């Protein structure tokens, strides 16, 4: 057999050309210090801020501090499984969470894992946890109303789709109740809801889930829970997980309502994490970037332009104050980021006025553009009369000899306050609210005893619903024109004659 060198060299050449070896390069380092859910890692010189890290036993971490000779990382999961000397690998990926229709009706943790015992989740898309908010050109002014079903809010502090409206007040003043009412009122509107519980008791979260289920609201709601027993990094991640899930629906042109309950505990979790990472503390021991922590979260709520689907995320962040001090660090930060605030007053709450919304100092900076005309027509007068009533109330405490006009104004004010009272989980549709306000500002309740006002309102609305087309006309025309005004006045007068 004759050996042909050129043939052999040809075969070798072909083999060399076709040879491909893929190199899987992974940066690795080792844990030099671990404790309190924080790990310091030596050797991860190419790690990026926010990059996911792989610890042994399937534990994940996130690189946050990139220092000269080590990386400070938070451990997402059980920190007891990490020990000094463990090998850590950089994944090259940033934190992301699964999103999709399958999440509706489920309770998940900050990592998007189900914690409700209803089986596994099959999500449709991975969404980055920290995504840049949409720019100015991609947005559109707020112009569609988001009805909460609460008369004080829809009338005097209206919210539009794409708005950020802060709910602020002391503990036990009904902040969560207002947010839950808003979620329950989205039934049959097509709005998807996300409730993010940060640092709350597990029993409280269980009650909220049960309440949403009883009201038939859980089917269009995602609950993201990072309870008080979870580590600070998981509490820090929870709101970003919630908004990432919401962005999936917004990108599809759908509307989302997200509640962050509450951002005070979120800031405390971030402070704990930052101090453990040895970042320098600032005012109230919060780190210097605590404003950016909330601004980058709340800026992701938006009303998108028609060119990119016209979807929206409406955010209702909640802040807890100490003894009504709204000038503390975190409250002032969040007030300056949001488009208005709903202030819940502990004095009103304790006097039996629920929901305890103080309409005088609550404000909505952009929601007015989203109100229907019929509501604008009646609510402006309600707000004015309420302001005058509160002013007169102060004077009335000093003297009893008041003239008839002042007494009449005080009596009207008492009835407006009575009309604004509302039971929890009993939302009013917008046309019913318009009728209630119309009735009180036109003096039809002035001679009705205060303890009979709410019965009058209830029976009047039932009468209009059963025997007239007035409510349907308000929905259709969205304004009270002369003919509808006359019809409504006649209906109220006829009802008043037979009311006893």
Curated annotation (Swiss-Prot):
Residues marked Required for activity (site):
362
Query: Which residues are ATP-binding?
Result: 169-176
Per UniProt, subcellular location reads as: Cell membrane
Question: What sections of the protein cross the membrane?
Answer: none
EC annotation?
Answer: 7.2.2.1
Tell me where it mainly resides: membrane
Q: What class of enzyme is it?
A: translocase
The protein's superkingdom reads: Bacteria
* PROSITE patterns membership: ATPASE_ALPHA_BETA (PS00152)
Q: Which Pfam families match?
A: ATP-synt_ab, ATP-synt_ab_C, ATP-synt_ab_N
* HAMAP family attached to this UniProt entry: ATP_synth_alpha_bact
Give the protein's biological function: Produces ATP from ADP in the presence of a sodium ion gradient across the membrane. The alpha chain is a regulatory subunit.
Further facts: The ATPase of P.modestum is of special interest because it uses sodium ions instead of protons as the physiological coupling ion.
By sequence similarity, the record places it as follows: Belongs to the ATPase alpha/beta chains family.
The entry's protein name is ATP synthase subunit alpha, sodium ion specific
Identify the species of origin: Propionigenium modestum
Gene for this protein?
A: atpA
């Amino acid at each position: 057999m004759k050996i042909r060198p050129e043939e052999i060299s040809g075969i070798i050449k072909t083999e060399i050309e076709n040879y491909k070896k893929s190199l899987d390069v992974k940066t690795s380092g080792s844990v030099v210090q671990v404790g309190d859910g924080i790990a310091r890692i030596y050797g991860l010189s190419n790690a990026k801020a926010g990059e996911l890290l792989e610890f042994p036993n399937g534990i994940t971490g996130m690189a946050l501090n990139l220092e000269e000779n080590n990386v400070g990382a938070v451990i997402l999961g059980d920190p007891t499984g990490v020990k000094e000397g463990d090998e850590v690998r950089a994944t090259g990926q940033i934190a992301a969470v699964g999103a999709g229709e399958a999440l509706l009706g489920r309770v998940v943790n900050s990592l998007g894992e189900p914690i409700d015992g209803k089986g596994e989740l099959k999500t449709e898309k991975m969404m980055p946890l920290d995504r840049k908010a949409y720019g100015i050109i991609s947005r559109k002014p707020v112009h569609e109303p988001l009805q909460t079903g609460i008369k004080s809010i829809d009338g005097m502090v209206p919210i539009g789709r794409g708005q950020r409206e802060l709910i602020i007040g002391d503990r036990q003043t009904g902040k969560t109740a207002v947010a839950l009412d808003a979620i329950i009122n989205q039934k049959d509107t097509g709005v998807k809801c996300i409730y993010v519980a940060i640092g709350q008791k597990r029993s409280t979260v269980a009650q909220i889930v049960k309440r949403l289920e009883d009201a038939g609201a859980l089917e269009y709601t995602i609950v993201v829970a990072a309870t008080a027993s979870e580590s600070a990094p998981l509490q820090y991640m929870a709101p970003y997980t919630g908004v990432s899930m919401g962005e999936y629906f917004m990108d599809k042109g759908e509307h989302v309502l997200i509640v962050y309950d509450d951002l005070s505990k979120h800031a405390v979790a971030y402070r704990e994490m930052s101090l453990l990472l040895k970042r320098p503390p600032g005012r109230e021991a919060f780190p210097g970037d605590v404003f950016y922590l909330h601004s980058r979260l709340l800026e992701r709520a938006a009303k998108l332009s028609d060119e990119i689907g016209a979807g929206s995320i409406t955010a209702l962040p909640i802040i807890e104050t100490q003894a009504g001090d709204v000038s503390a660090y975190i409250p002032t930060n969040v007030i300056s980021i949001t488009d208005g605030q709903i202030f819940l007053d502990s004095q009103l709450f304790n006097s039996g006025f629920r929901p305890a919304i103080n309409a005088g100092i609550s404000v909505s900076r952009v929601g007015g553009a989203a109100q229907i005309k019929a509501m604008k027509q009646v609510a402006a007068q309600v707000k004015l009369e309420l302001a005058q009533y509160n002013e007169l109330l102060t004077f009335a405490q000093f003297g009893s000899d008041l003239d008839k006009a002042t007494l009449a104004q005080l009596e009207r004010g008492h009835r407006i306050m009575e009309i604004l009272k509302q039971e929890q989980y009993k939302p009013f549709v917008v046309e019913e609210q318009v009728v209630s306000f119309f009735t009180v500002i036109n003096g039809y309740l002035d001679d009705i005893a205060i303890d009979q006002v709410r019965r009058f309102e209830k029976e009047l609305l039932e009468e209009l619903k059963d025997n007239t087309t007035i409510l349907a006309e308000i929905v259709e025309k969205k304004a009270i024109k002369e003919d509808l005004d006359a019809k409504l006045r006649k209906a109220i007068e006829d009802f008043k004659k037979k009311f006893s």
